Amino acid sequence: MEKTKINDILTYDFYSSLEISNDEKYLAFLKTNADLDENKYNSYLYLFDIEKNKKYKVSDNKNIGIFIFDENDNLIYKEKSDDKFDYFYKKDKSMGVGSLEFKIDKNVSYIKDLKNGYYLIKASDKLSEDERKKQKENSFYKEVTKLPFWFNGTGYINNQKQSLYLFKKEDKSLQKIRNFENESLNAFAINKNANKLALVLGKNDNKVSRLRDDLVILDLENKEEKIIIENEFSYYDLFFNDKDEIIFVASDMRKGGINEDAFIYKTNLTGEYKKISPDDFDKSFGNSIGSDARHEAYRTFFYKNNKFYFVVTEKEESKLYSLDENENIKLEISGCVEDFAIANDNIYYFAMTEDRISHLKEKKNNKILLDNKINSSLGTIEEFFYESNGDKIRGYVLLPVDFDKNKKYPTLLSIHGGPKTEFSNIFHHEHQVFANDGYIIIYTNPHGSSGNGVKYSDIRGKYGTIDYEDLMNFTDFAIKKYPQIDENNMGVYGGSYGGFMTNWIVCHTDRFKAANSQRSISNWTSFYGVSDIGYYFAPDQTGANPWDNLEKMWEQSPIKHAKNVKTPTMFIHSDEDYRCPLEQGLQMYTRIKENGVDTKMYIFHGENHELSRSGKPKARIKRLEKIKEWFDGYLKWKEK
């Protein structure tokens, strides 16, 4: 079997966006592949015949992203888009090709068949020819009036406006329901009778986006609008049940700050709400397990047949649960659920494991319907528990391919981002590349990670203390448990929060022979004003701000301690990273350079905070080549 190599990301099929037909005979999904020649990703739409257990490509279009089954089980999908129109095609379930069904003079980002002769559409305006010309003429400057003023993966966000529309199938007319000028539409739902909309609106006080939203009911018949819950929650998503009540997932952020785990609530149309998930159901909603082998969108919540379905991260798994109309919670599927579609008597879902990326399964027979097994050699992942700061924490060791217990191996401590995400035992391409080249990889989920409740994940004001202790205790334990770890040839690396911790570690210990800090935070005081989340994330996480308690914020900043760095450290950053902007890495690079310590920095043009997960193929390959080159130069162990 061939080794897992850096370029293997070009061979992977990433399945996502799972939908099921009304007659429950077909599934539809996207298959995304990296395209090195065009340096992008191609997403193809597929149908899956459940009875025949076969998949069919719907279109040769490489950029399909929006699709639905209509009430007659035809596939409706956006085939193409130009300066004037978005073009939607229709295809039945035969092997024939699709045909143009309608076109809309908007940039459509959402479509839902209301089954009453209308589609519900979310869209923004296309620029007119004069507007495009003016935009080009004025491209040498930007006007900034909002906070945040940019957003990672989007860029400057000053005048991006969305609206909701009804599209009439019969005459193909478009009727605006509402636009959103001075507020953001963060979530919405329509009731069964299609006469009421529930809107989660993010208000912008003085053009500053606030953290808590308003829940608004819009009557589509009389156009009346009413705020029923004002400035109370940060919402994840919401749905109408069959009784015209609203089920929503939200956090009031009063116990654990912005990273507090949410709960499930129910409200009537007057805003009388109650919590319907138990107080001890302290789990992180959504799949926060890290991997560099997934792509596109995944479903977290769904309502069907009087049941609310939701994915949570619990321990080191992403599990699918349901909540029925009697408020009983049931575990439906364990493991790592990536996406799901609900049938009347079955659940279809994409899962990930240690040797398979997103593959299609069904719950009823626990059967793989569409396999996606990694066809290269994989190192073995072993798990163990260690104690740190009063908790028993799971640790992972990925052993090299052809592991020999009588040898010593260079070892990398890998640190995840977040901090409220986590590692698991699922496939991680980057880790396996190192394991296939003679490295041991060790990783864990220190305090601050998700999956263990709000008390465990809440490290506000403790950055660089309890989490640092966990990582060092874990490293010590791993060395004792695995004498094959060459403790004189160890490296440390991570991105985002993992980059922050890498910065912190090299400022506080010399035990690692080399380090690689990616898309990191180094200075909370400057991060506050330049990150798309800085103005609220930095005060929340540090318990300080630059004006009232500067020293507290400064003390938690790695750059404050960077004069101590002796570890050769390489930095990777993207120049369009607006989450952890480039200047954060440059500050550490500058100080370490002044220390006379070996350092270098790679800046990736046109990439953002997602470089390692969804960056353009050439950039992802080059990034991993440079990381490996750096560690090989310092750690590569040779038998003497």
Show the residue positions of the predicted features.
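Predominantly five- to eight-bladed beta-propeller fold
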Residues: 42-43, 124-165, 213, 262-265, ...
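Short, solvent-exposed loop/turn segments at conserved positions within beta-propeller repeat blades
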Residues: 37-42, 81-85, 155-161, 206-213, ...
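Cap/lid segment of the alpha/beta-hydrolase catalytic domain
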Residues: 375-488, 495, 529
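Non-catalytic accessory segments flanking enzyme active sites
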Residues: 17-19, 122, 143-144, 150-151, ...
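Short loop/turn segments that connect beta-strands within beta-propeller blades
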Residues: 50-52, 92-95, 168-172, 219-223, ...
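Active-site-proximal cap/loop segments of hydrolase catalytic domains
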Residues: 446-640
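Conserved beta-propeller blade repeats
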Residues: 12-27, 61-78, 103-118, 122, ...
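A short beta-strand motif characteristic of beta-propeller blades
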Residues: 4-9, 54-58, 99-102, 175-178, ...
